[in-house]
């Protein structure tokens, strides 16, 4: 397991996502005492008893994600770790779900895995706001993940001390950003 911990002299104000409501900004800037928005999550489709896709509005975008829980998971009696898995530039959540193999690992090791879909830019490419691809700079991905963590704490009873992120390519960059900006992310790989 590869673990990253971020620390710098840069203040959080220097690295915050654009949250002014333009170009998809959300309602959270990552710092201060601002309220984290409640997500209105809707079931889109069910893959099987353990896996389903969901959608929620955030900022100017409809955001999608796939959730896989291990067999016989009961959120009322069990608190499990949470792993976000992020696709690369031009990738898709269903694709990284298929080739990452995390569903099987989650079943064996008992954790919840969430495959989050990045936003689509004006060129039809999908990705994340990591200050690399200009067409995603106005997207508040950090605020969205903060709201997702709040949702999973309330709806899935996740273990707050075991929230992780993993990603491929641009999704890996987003995982780095989450680890640096969100204290809830314990490590990335």
Q: What positions do the PLM features span?
A:
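A domain-start/cap signature at the N-terminus of enzymes
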Residues: 6-82, 108, 137, 166-189
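Serine-hydrolase catalytic machinery in alpha/beta-hydrolase-like enzymes
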Residues: 62-66, 73, 78-164, 174-177, ...
């Amino acid at each position: 397991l590869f673990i990253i911990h971020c620390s710098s002299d840069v203040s959080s104000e220097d690295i915050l996502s654009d949250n002014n409501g333009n170009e998809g900004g959300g309602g959270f800037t990552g710092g201060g005492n601002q309220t984290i928005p409640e997500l209105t999550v809707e079931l889109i489709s069910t893959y099987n008893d353990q896996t389903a896709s969901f959608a929620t509005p955030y900022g100017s975008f409809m955001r999608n994600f796939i959730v896989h829980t291990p067999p016989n998971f009961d959120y009322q009696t069990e608190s499990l770790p949470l792993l976000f898995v992020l696709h690369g530039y031009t990738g898709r959540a269903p694709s990284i779900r298929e080739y990452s193999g995390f569903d099987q690992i989650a079943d064996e090791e008992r954790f919840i895995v969430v495959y989050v879909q990045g936003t689509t830019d004006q060129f039809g490419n999908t990705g994340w706001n990591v200050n690399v691809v200009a067409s995603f700079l106005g997207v508040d991905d950090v605020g969205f993940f903060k709201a997702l963590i709040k949702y999973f704490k309330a709806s899935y009873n996740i273990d707050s001390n075991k929230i992780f992120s993993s990603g491929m390519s641009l999704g890996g960059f987003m995982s780095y950003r989450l680890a640096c900006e969100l204290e809830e992310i314990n490590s990335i790989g």
